[in-house]
């Protein structure tokens, strides 16, 4: 395996695209830190799948839109693996509603999870990666950033960057 000894963090790794990315990275030799916000059971299932295939993974709960959680996540990665080689910013939520009916707290939740989290995790990862002068950061987006969907103004505005 070409990436033995390298570590990747995947946010939102307990299901969907994040799960698929985590499995792919593990199959290529990365030790994978599986971040999840709510479903420990789903994250543990991904960890088990990776380990059953001979890979290395650990789960770490945290809301990546909260700086204290991000600090804890990165301290844990440094302790467990010594550093980080790849960050995949995949965590995301939606709170669909027509703009004129959207509650401000739903707007704010999407902005925090889908945008602020990228700032916080990228800042922490870049600090680790700059020390070793190597690393990769991948931000997952959506076609909704190009075409938009009814009821997803908050989600779509984050993706066209």
Place the predicted regions along the sequence by residue.
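Conserved glycine-rich Rossmann-like NAD(P)H-binding loop of the short-chain dehydrogenase/reductase
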Residues: 28-45
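The beta1-alpha1 cofactor-binding region of Rossmann-like NAD(H)/NADP(H)-dependent oxidoreductases
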Residues: 40, 61-73, 104
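A short, exposed helix-loop element centered on a Lys and neighboring polar residues
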Residues: 122-123
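Substrate-binding pocket helix/loop in short-chain dehydrogenase/reductase
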Residues: 98-99, 106-111
């Amino acid at each position: 395996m070409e990436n033995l000894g390298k570590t990747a963090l995947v946010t939102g790794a307990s299901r969907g695209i994040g799960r698929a990315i985590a499995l792919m990275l593990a199959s290529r030799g990365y030790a994978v830190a599986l971040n999840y916000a709510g479903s420990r059971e789903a994250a543990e299932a991904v960890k088990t799948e990776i380990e059953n295939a001979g890979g290395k993974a650990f789960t770490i709960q945290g809301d990546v839109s909260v700086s204290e959680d991000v600090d804890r996540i990165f301290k844990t990665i440094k302790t467990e693996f010594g550093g980080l080689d790849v960050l995949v910013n995949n965590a995301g939520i939606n709170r669909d509603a027509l703009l004129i009916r959207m509650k401000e707290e739903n707007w704010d939740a999407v902005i925090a999870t889908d945008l602020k989290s990228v700032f916080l995790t990228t800042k922490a990862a870049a600090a680790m990666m700059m020390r070793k002068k190597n690393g990769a950061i991948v931000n997952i987006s959506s076609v909704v950033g190009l075409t938009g969907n009814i009821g997803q103004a908050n989600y779509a505005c984050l993706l066209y960057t």
